C-alpha cells in the first residue's frame, strides 16, 4: 500500500473557523452505539440511504451545495485532494438532500504519524455485495485490516444546523490474547489461522505469563544465590588478602630475626678470629723483639771486643802480653757462648679454619617456622560434661603455626600420699577434644601442648574438669505420700559429694499433661517433700548435679496422691515383732523361751511391743485403716517421734491411742492419753478401725469402718509432727491399709 503524506500535511493546516473539533472521549461508547446499530456499515450505503431521504425536501439544492463545500474543506484540510474516489463516494449530484439535520456530524480517525497511511475501511456486507472500494486505497478484502476513517453524526444546536468535525484519539492496537512459543512473542488468536504463525505452537497468554513469571522467579532465586556466593567469595578473598598480609609480616619478621641472628653470629666469629690472630701476632712480635735485642747485645759485645783487640795491637809488648792473656780468656768465654741466629718466629701465619656449622644451621632455620607458644586451656563450661566424658577446649596465639595438639590428663590425686595416678594422652588437630571413658563424678587434671615441625610448645596451665555424677537411686520403699505432697528419698549413687539434686515429675495417664515435666531444683540433701495435686498419679525421676552437669535420670518411681501412704518403720520395731516385706503387716509370734529384759533405747521400743509408721511430715488430713482380729489385744494411735520407748502407748502426754483387750468373752475399749481414758462402751467390736489425723483442727478420730461409726475423737496439742503407732500385747497380727480415699462419713469429724 502506498504511503500517504497528505494526512500529516493536512494536520499542519489551520482549521476553518466554521468547524468545531471535539475529542471522541467526550462521547461515551454507549452514546455512539445507538447511532450505529450495525457495526462496520459501508459509508457509501449509509450516505446513499440518507441522501434518498433528503430528496423530499424543498431546499435540497442549497443544502447539497453547503455539504459539498464542507466536504471539500475537509478534503483540503486533511490533504485528500488526490483521492478522487473518496470524493465520489461522498457526493452524488443526482440525489437531492433535505436538511443537514439528517446527517450526523462526521469525524475522521487519524493514524499514528509514524505509521503508514492505511486504506479506509468500509466493512460490511453491503460493500462486498456492491464490490465497492476506495480505488487507490485498496480493495474490500484489504480494508478488513484498516481502521474506520469517517463517521457521521448529527445534532441540533439551535434552529440552524452546524456540521462538527470531531477528531478521535488514536486507538490502541487490539490486545494480544495468545503467545507464539516458536516466535516467542504475543499475538492475536486470528493470526494463528491466517498469518505466518499458522504452523507455530501457541499457548494462552496467561499460561505464558505464569510460565515467564516462574522462570523469572527461578532466575531471581539463582541470581540471589549467586549473589550470596559471590559475596561469600568476596569476603573470603578479603580474608585471604588479610591473611597474605599477615603471613608476609610473619615471614618478614622471621627472616629479619634470622638474618640478624646470622649477622650477629658472623660478627662474633669475626671478633673471635681477629682477637686470636692478634694474640698470635703479639706472640711472634715479642719473640722476634727478644731475639732482636739479644742479637744487638751480642753485636755490641763483638764490636767492643774488636775495638779492644785493635787497641791492644798498638800497645807495647809487655802491656800487650798482659792484656792479651786477659783478653784471650774473655774472648774464649764469649766465643764459647752459642749465639742463636735462627728466627724464632716465622712471619707466616697458619691458615685459619672457619667453622660455619652453626651459621649453616641458622641459615637452614630461616625457612623453618618457630615452635609454638604454650596454649591457654579454658576453664570447664558448666553443664558440659556427662557421667563418662568431658569436653576440653583451649586457645592459641594467632601468630603460631600448629600441626597438632597433645592433650594429657589424669585423675586428681586423693589425700593418700605417694599415689601416682596414670597419665593419658590424646592427639588431636582441633582446639577441643571430647575425652570419654571417664569415671562419673570425678575430677581430672588436663594440660595441653602444641606441636609443629620446630618441636613442641611448653605445656599449658593445668585445669581441673569434672565429670557429671552417676544417677541417684530412689528408695521406693521409703516413699511417703498424701493427697497434697510426696516425700522422696534416694541414695546419692556417688562416692564423692555432689552439688545438688533435681526432682523431675510427670503426670501419668494424663493426655492433657503428656510430656510436661516439672522440676524441683537445688535440693541439697537426699530427700525432698514435693507439693502435688490430689487424686493424681506421677512418675518421678531424680538427677544429681555438680559443676560438670546433671546426671542422667534415675530409675522412675510412681506415686499416687490418693490418701496417705506410709510403711512401718523397722528401725522403731520391738524385737518381738516381725514386719512383712511390704511394710504393712506386723506379726507377734509365740515365744517359747522366757523373754529377757531389753536394754533401753531411744530408737526402738523395748517395753511396749510396738512399731511406728513413717507418715509424711505434711500438715493436713491423714487417714488410714487397721485390720485386726476381734479377739486380739492391741493398741493403735499416734505418737511424737521422741516418745519414750520404754513406756506403753497412751501412758504419757506424747501419745494417743485406742486400746482393746479381750478377756472372759468381754471386749474392753480404752482411749488413752497420759494414762487417762473416757468411759465409753462399744457394743460391736470393730474388725477394721479407721483413724483420721486432722492437723488443722488438732484432732485424732477413730471409726468403725464396717459400720461407718464414729468411736471417739481426741483434741490434741500437735505442736510437732506425729507418726502412727501400732502395738500387739498378745501374739497375733495386724495389717495397715493406707493410700485410700477418705470415706464420706469421716469428713464430718
Swiss-Prot record:
**Which SUPFAM superfamilies does the protein's record reference?**
B-box zinc-binding domain, Concanavalin A-like lectins/glucanases, Fibronectin type III
Record's CDD domains? FN3, SPRY_PRY_TRIM76_like
Which positions are tagged coiled coil? Answer: 205-317
* Superkingdom of the source species: Eukaryota
Its annotated compartments are: Nucleus; Sarcoplasmic reticulum; Cytoplasm, Perinuclear region
Q: Which Pfam families match?
A: fn3 (PF00041), SPRY (PF00622)
Where would I find the Fibronectin type-III domain in this sequence? 375-470, 471-564
GO annotations of cellular component type: nucleus; perinuclear region of cytoplasm; sarcoplasmic reticulum
Asked whether the UniProt record includes Calcium among its keywords, one would answer no
Q: Which UniProt keywords apply?
A: Coiled coil, Cytoplasm, Nucleus, Repeat, Sarcoplasmic reticulum
**Which intervals hold domain B30.2/SPRY?**
546-744
Record's InterPro entries? B30.2/SPRY (IPR001870), B30.2/SPRY_sf (IPR043136), Butyrophylin_SPRY (IPR003879), ConA-like_dom_sf (IPR013320), E3_ligase_FN3/SPRY (IPR050617), FN3_dom (IPR003961), FN3_sf (IPR036116), Ig-like_fold (IPR013783)
Q: Subunit notes for this chain?
A: Interacts with CMYA5. In cardiac muscles, identified in a complex composed of FSD2, CMYA5 and RYR2.
Its protein name is Fibronectin type III and SPRY domain-containing protein 2
Q: Which organism is it from?
A: Homo sapiens (Human)
Name of the encoding gene? FSD2
